Amino acid sequence: MPKELNGWLDEVVKAAKKRKAVIKSRERNLYDIKDSIVKKKEKKLNPIIAEFKRRSPSGLKQDRDPLEYAKLMERFGAAALSILTEPLYFSGSYETFEAISRNVKLPLLFKDFVVTEAQVDTAYSIGADAVLLIVKILKDNELCFLYDYIKSYGMVPLVEVENEKDLNTADACGAEMIGINARDLNSLNVNVDRVAALLKIAPLKSIKVAESGIQDRSQILRLLESGADAFLIGTALMKDPQKIKLLI
């Protein structure tokens, strides 16, 4: 069983455990998100993981055509796409993810509150190349089990952390790709300074992704100096997709 949680996180996780798996033959090749990030860095570009989400608990309400957005991000040079599939608070769906997966050739991150094997099975079936795991909502043994389960499909786990304790937990599971979230999932407050501090002590061997709160190039440059390898950006790009050209 996942950790005991409160508020909206508890509601989301309880609902996630009840969602039915979508099991079908995968139609899409696997695209390596780590390789995509490395190639962008080799070209002296900022690797951007552009996120599609219609809504968020922090107040975002932005309805865009998902295919138009995904194709635009691909054309403008995103390293990967992150797609919210959580329905209650983010208005996400498996159908939107699968539609995007059929129309772009970028690595796709399955962004949800993953607590069951069924969700991982679904992610693979609908075309995911990477799957988010959130340390905050999983017990240590659950995290490591799901980490290995994701890898068994050939997908990449992105392990999300909020603090130094989370970092140590992620490292103990062998995390090769770590996301450092500026947003506290309880309060929803954003602190980009915390990301910069955690980047400096994150395992050198891992690919480090700065998540949440990134609005401009100056923030990216500061996070690069702290050790970030890639940047997951949602709200800023959902509001203005053209902004990616200023951030890459």
Which sequence ranges carry the predicted segments?
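Glycine-enriched alpha-helix->loop->beta-strand junction motifs that scaffold or abut catalytic
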Residues: 77-78, 103-106, 125-131, 151-155, ...
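Short secondary-structure transition/capping segments
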Residues: 3, 126-137, 157-165, 181-185, ...
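Short catalytic-loop micro-motif centered on adjacent basic/acidic residues
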Residues: 82-83, 109-110, 132-133, 157, ...
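Alpha-helical elements of the RecA-like P-loop NTPase motor core of helicases
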Residues: 121, 168, 221
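Glycine-rich phosphate-binding active-site loops on the catalytic face of alpha/beta enzymes
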Residues: 83, 125-142, 179-188, 228-246
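Hydrophobic, well-structured mid-protein blocks that either form specific transmembrane helices
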Residues: 100-151
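Catalytic-face loop-and-helix region of soluble metabolic enzyme cores
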Residues: 177-226
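Conserved N-terminal beta1-alpha1 strand-loop-helix module at the mouth
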Residues: 1-108, 115-117, 149, 155-176, ...
